A protein has these predicted regions:
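Generic non-transmembrane alpha-helical segments
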Residues: 2-10, 63, 149, 153
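Short, conserved, surface-exposed binding loops centered on an aromatic residue
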Residues: 22-24, 34, 72-75, 105
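Flexible, Gly/Pro-enriched loop and linker segments at secondary-structure and domain junctions
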Residues: 71, 78-85, 90-126
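Helical lid/core segments from catalytic subdomains that handle acyl or acyl-like groups
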Residues: 36-94
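Active-site-proximal acidic secondary-structure segment that organizes catalysis
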Residues: 11, 54, 107-158
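Short intrinsically disordered coil segments
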Residues: 46-49, 97-102, 128-130, 146-148
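Hydrophobic "lid/gating" helix adjacent to the active-site nucleophile
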Residues: 1-30
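Acyl/amide activation-and-transfer machinery of modular secondary-metabolite enzymes
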Residues: 26-51, 126-132
Length: 158
């Protein structure tokens, strides 16, 4: 939720390449992996990032619980943000699956965000986050702005 909101704070993350054009989207939807209780098979949940953090989490629980397929293809479009989490290990980088031989692979501009296990060290919490983007649209300055926005949003939880 906070990552999605922080990405929405940086307009460059809303840009997508469509043919010869770059468009700026309005709403972007998180599309994330989830494990059903008692299973090691994950599925991909896609839903709007709406309401408060508590409302979003409750809605995500409902949507995930009712989903009976690996991925609902009806909700798949380029207005997504892909999220994944590896809470079992600290991560410094993650590479996501991409169809590099597809004709429009170079235009894939859906951001992919992954984080791992947080580390507590000297009374500070560290969390490695991997951010994959299309460099034709997003540069280091935008990723830095995302990191700053995410930090502000996390600190506002206190």
């Amino acid at each position: 939720y906070l990552c999605c909101k922080a990405l929405q704070d940086v307009p460059a993350f809303a840009c997508r390449i469509r043919g010869e054009n770059v468009v700026e989207l309005g709403e972007q939807k998180p599309s994330f992996t989830d494990l059903k209780k008692g299973s090691e098979l994950f599925h991909i949940v896609t839903m709007p990032c709406e309401g408060s953090i508590a409302e979003f989490c409750e809605r995500a629980r409902e949507v995930s619980g009712k989903q009976d397929c690996f991925i609902d293809m009806a909700g798949q479009a380029d207005d997504l943000i892909y999220f994944s989490c590896l809470p079992w290990m600290d991560v410094t980088a993650v590479t996501n699956e991409r169809e590099l031989l597809a004709p429009n692979a170079r235009d894939d501009s859906i951001p992919r965000i992954c984080w791992g296990k947080y580390i507590l060290e000297n009374d500070r919490v560290y969390l490695g986050i991997s951010v994959e983007v299309n460099h034709r649209l997003i540069d280091g300055v935008h990723i830095g702005r995302f990191a700053e926005a995410l930090t502000r949003r996390i600190q506002a939880l206190k």
